[in-house]
Structures are given as structure tokens and as C-alpha cells.
Design a protein with these regions (language model features):
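Early-domain small/polar-rich strand-loop-helix modules and first-structured segments
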Residues: 1-83, 149, 360-431
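Glycine-rich phosphate-binding loops at beta-strand->alpha-helix junctions
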Residues: 119-131, 228-256, 263
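Small-residue (GG/TT-enriched) beta-loop-alpha framework at ligand/catalytic clefts
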Residues: 121, 129, 136-222
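Acidic, glycine/GT-rich loop-and beta-edge segments that sit at the periphery of enzyme/chaperone cores
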Residues: 270, 277-372
Length: 431
């Protein structure tokens, strides 16, 4: 690889192992780093061994030293860090940051120097705890919000799928992910629009009994029933089988049930490759022809009506489709002479926009021309937003009164084009 060119990193953090892929624009597809030269051994166990003399070992090298008395062995690093979200200790937070840093440094095997343009981390479920942990990792590694992004398995599956040839996604696309005793099913549905094709993912999850996991014939029978249930009433072009659970030659009846009119692929590294595609794709300003919608995406646009140079206009507070946990812009605005805020809500998939009128009360006691507010829309999730206004003072002439107004706004509200007025005074606790 040419070290002078931009490169992108995709990291798959599973429950007990990680994988990493590198991608450059002159490559046909991302390349997954193997832990053994000449072999497709991609999984890196999420374990560490901290030797007392200061040396740290990761993955398989740590497992070799697990029983040695000259250090400490740590396993389940990702799960341990997630559990620390509600505890006082942060030991596993530090270990997880160290592990991710080590993964990124594997780029040096390919002669790549400097920081990647973007790192994308994909995890099974992007829960509140996972979001907080990954934000902590980003801060500790000194990456910006654009330089380290994160997503769940459904989105990385989407990113991998729609970077393949079109014949593979003419209809729905399915993925079975089987790791340990956890079996998951993802089904991508695509809806063509005028400019962008909208994609959503249906999900199902099972905990496979240990007595079945260890018996090939029972597993084949169990999985055959899962396939029947999952494929019912769906036209599917392609099926991916991902994870260690599909090792061994036990897929017999299951493949018969799947049918012969679908393409099938068996592998381990689809999700890390999808993350690498995402690191590259989401770093580009140009619009892609596909949009993935899920519960952690903002479900609409939120615009604030303003007056500028005698004409009405709008400024964008919330962008539809952005992750709800991403930073939103803030603006400083002068008071326009009327205690009314007008918002326009445009929901994804809705034909018409809605207008919401909000009325301010208890304005600061000073001339209207000296009223200036800082305004920002702060998401709570993909559909709920808090519109926050604070008195910004007016330079050296008037200090801020400290007053704050907060307006709850629902992006999924139903109703007509104009909503009823709501009156809001300063937030409780404001002066």
C-alpha cells in the first residue's frame, strides 16, 4: 500500500473478539487483516495480559499467557467496559481504549503511517451504554466526531451489501450471524425513491440452547426452522452466513430449505468490511444513492424560521438521517420583535411539512434590540428533541440574565400542517 494516500479503517467489535479491515479508494474492496500470515484468520480475541514488568499482550498472545503468574489476564474487555457505565470503576474503559488503539496500529503492517482519514466501529447493538463508551474512546484517542464514527451490525451489513454488484440486491438481502450461542437474522428491505433508495433492516434474535449448538444434526434441524420462519413471504436475492457458528459441514437441510433461487455466501469478515466502506463513504461530502434508516437516525428535519435582510428564511437545526447522538449546531440570533418561535418539521417519508408555533414568556428586562439568544436543538433519541434557548447577553452592554427556555419537540408528531401554540417560560432554575 502507498503510505501517502488516504486510508480508512473498519473495526468489528463482537462480544468476545474483534476484526479490522483497511480500505483505500484504489482498492477493489476492503482488506481484512489476518492474525496469521497466509491464512484467513481474522478474529482477535478481546483479551489482554498485562505483564508486571510493563509489557502488554493482546488477543492470541494474551491467551498463551493466561495462566502465567507474572501478570494479570483480562477477558471480555468490551462487555466489561459496557458494564462499567453504571459502576464507579473505569478499569475496563482504559483497557478497551488501549485495545482499540492497538487495533488501529495494525495498519503499520501495510506500511501505512499517520492517522486514518476515518475509523468506523461497528458493534452488535448500539445501546446507550455502547454510545457512551465509544464516545469515551473517541475522546481518549483524540479523534474528532468525523474521524471516528460508530454504527450497529445492521448498518454495517447495509454498507457492505450496497457496495456489491446490483444483481445481489435486486430483492431483499438476508444475513444470519451466528457467534457463540447467539443467532441473529437481518433482512434488508429497499424502497426506491426519486433521488435516494431507502433501506431498513428487519431483525430477529435467538439464544440457541447449548445442547443444540454442540450437535450437528440438531443444529441443522433447528436452523432449518429458523430459515422457514425468517424467509416466509419474502423475495430474497442473497443470503450471507457470518460467524464461527457456521463452521463445520452441518448446513444440509438448512440449505435445502433456503432453496436454489438465492445466492449464498459464507464468511467471517462481512461486518468489518462494511464498517470500512462506511468510514470511506461517510467521509465524502457527495450524496450516496442509498440511505439507511433505523431507530438511532433522526426521523426528520427541524428548521427554524428567521428573518434576514427583510426576508423570511430558515436555518437547519436537525438534519434528517444523522445519528441522534451526533453534535448539532448552535446559533446566536437577535430577537425579532415577536415572542414567537416558528419551527418547520419535515418527517422522513411524509409528503408535507408541519409547522409548530412556540411562544416565549418572561423575556429579560432590557430593550428588545439588545435581546440575543443562543439556540440549539438537542436530540434525546431519533424522534424527540429539546429546543434550548438561553439568554446570551449583549456584549459589554448587558450581561446574560441566565434564563433558559426548553421546548420539547416531537419529530414524529401527527396532525395537520399547523400545530397549536404552546407557551413556555424560562426553565425551572433559570434566574
Amino acid at each position: 500500500m502507498d503510505q501517502k494516500k488516504e486510508f480508512y479503517v473498519g473495526i468489528d467489535i463482537g462480544r468476545d473478539r474483534a476484526m479490522i479491515s483497511l480500505y483505500r479508494e484504489d482498492q477493489k474492496e476492503p482488506e481484512t487483516i489476518s492474525t496469521v500470515r497466509g491464512m484467513e484468520k481474522f478474529g482477535i480475541p478481546l483479551v489482554m495480559f498485562l505483564e508486571k514488568k510493563g509489557t502488554t499482550y493482546y488477543g492470541d498472545e494474551a491467551l498463551k499467557r493466561k495462566e502465567q503468574p507474572n501478570g494479570d489476564f483480562f477477558e471480555d474487555i468490551y462487555e466489561g467496559a459496557l458494564q462499567e457505565q453504571t459502576e464507579e470503576t473505569t478499569l475496563y474503559h482504559g483497557l478497551f481504549v488501549q485495545f482499540v488503539r492497538r487495533l488501529i496500529r495494525l495498519k503499520e503492517r501495510y506500511g501505512l503511517k499517520g492517522d486514518p482519514t476515518c475509523v468506523a466501529i461497528t458493534v452488535p447493538v448500539l445501546s446507550q451504554q455502547a454510545i457512551a463508551l465509544l464516545q469515551y474512546v473517541r475522546q481518549e484517542l483524540d479523534f474528532s466526531e468525523k474521524e471516528l464514527i460508530f454504527m450497529d451490525y445492521a448498518e454495517s451489513f447495509f454498507l457492505h451489501t450496497y457496495h456489491q454488484e446490483a444483481v445481489l440486491w435486486q430483492h431483499d438481502v438476508a444475513m444470519f450471524y451466528f457467534q457463540g450461542a447467539e443467532l441473529s437474522f437481518y433482512l434488508l428491505h429497499r424502497k426506491s425513491g426519486l433521488k435516494v433508495q431507502f433501506v431498513t433492516a428487519e431483525q430477529k434474535h435467538w439464544q440457541v440452547p447449548e445442547s443444540i449448538c454442540t450437535h450437528a444434526e440438531l443444529m441443522d434441524e433447528y436452523f432449518s426452522n429458523v430459515v422457514r420462519e425468517s424467509f416466509a413471504k419474502h423475495a430474497i436475492s442473497t443470503v450471507y452466513f457470518v460467524g464461527d457458528g457456521f463452521d463445520g459441514n452441518w448446513l444440509r437441510e438448512s440449505l435445502r430449505v433456503m432453496g436454489t433461487n438465492k445466492r449464498g455466501f459464507l464468511g467471517k469478515n462481512l461486518l468489518t468490511r462494511g464498517a470500512a466502506y462506511g468510514a470511506w463513504r461517510y467521509s465524502k461530502p457527495e450524496t450516496w444513492g442509498f440511505f439507511f434508516n433505523c431507530e438511532y437516525k433522526m426521523q426528520g428535519e427541524l428548521d427554524l424560521r428567521i428573518e434576514s435582510q427583510g426576508a423570511d428564511g430558515f436555518i437547519r437545526l436537525i438534519e434528517a438521517g444523522q445519528n441522534w447522538f451526533c453534535q448539532t449546531p448552535s446559533f446566536k440570533l437577535l430577537y425579532g420583535g415577536t415572542p414567537e418561535i416558528v419551527l418547520k418539521i419535515s418527517r422522513i417519508g411524509a409528503a408535507n411539512s408541519q409547522v409548530l408555533h412556540l411562544e416565549l414568556t418572561d423575556l429579560p428586562d432590557r430593550p428588545e434590540a439588545a435581546l440575543r439568544f443562543r439556540i440549539q436543538a438537542i436530540p434525546k433519541n431519533g424522534t424527540e428533541v429539546t429546543l434550548r434557548l438561553s439568554d446570551d447577553g449583549f456584549g459589554g452592554f448587558f450581561k446574560s440574565s441566565g434564563k433558559i427556555w426548553e421546548f420539547p419537540v416531537a419529530l414524529d408528531m401527527e396532525g395537520g400542517s399547523t400545530m397549536e401554540k404552546a407557551r413556555y417560560g424560562p426553565k425551572k432554575g433559570g434566574r
